[in-house]
Amino acid sequence: MSHSSQTRVQLRTVCLFIALGLLVGCQPNDEDPGLWLKGTEVTRPVTDWTFTQSVDEILIETQPWYGLPHSTTIWCVQLDGALYIGSYGNERKHWEKSIANDPRARLSIQGDLYPVQIRPVIEGELSQQILERYNQKYDMEEVFGKDVPEWWFYQVEQPEASAKKKPS
């Protein structure tokens, strides 16, 4: 093998390792999305999510149609021990579109990874209670000013809990 061929092979190898490093270590940062989430997988069921009340931001990883995970930073609140996440604005976010097709997701909360299912909150009264919690936790007027945008909320369920709720 010639010296120039060896150099090309080495360059390709280095580029491959750099690309793999970016893919494997690409977690979201603030408003910048990422791919796979890192952390310790939690396999025990969570029956009370109140520990999230002191957590300002969590990460969500969804599975879009194109096969690579999509992760982003989101806010959360707990209400009566249940966990809810939300999104605002005129257009649905990328993660919302993904869960509309596949409700399975993973949440990263303080370095722990929770496999979950995400379901839209349809009930108006519950949505209002969640919005009040969001206002308490995040002071929406301070964040958005007087024009607080419309919000959509989603309930976080663990796969085992979702399976138990199905009618027989």
Residue positions per predicted region:
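Hydrophobic helical h-region of N-terminal Sec-dependent signal peptides
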Residues: 16-20
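Short, conserved active-site entrance elements at the starts or edges of catalytic domains
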Residues: 27-69
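Short, structured beta-strand-loop surface elements
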Residues: 38-40, 45-48, 66-69, 90-168
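Short, surface-exposed loop and linker segments with low hydrophobicity and enrichment for Pro/Ser/Thr
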Residues: 50-53, 75, 146-147
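C-terminal motif of bacterial Sec signal peptides marking the signal peptidase cleavage site
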Residues: 22-25
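Bacterial N-terminal signal peptides that target proteins for export
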Residues: 2-15
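Short beta-strand segments
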Residues: 55-89, 105, 116-118
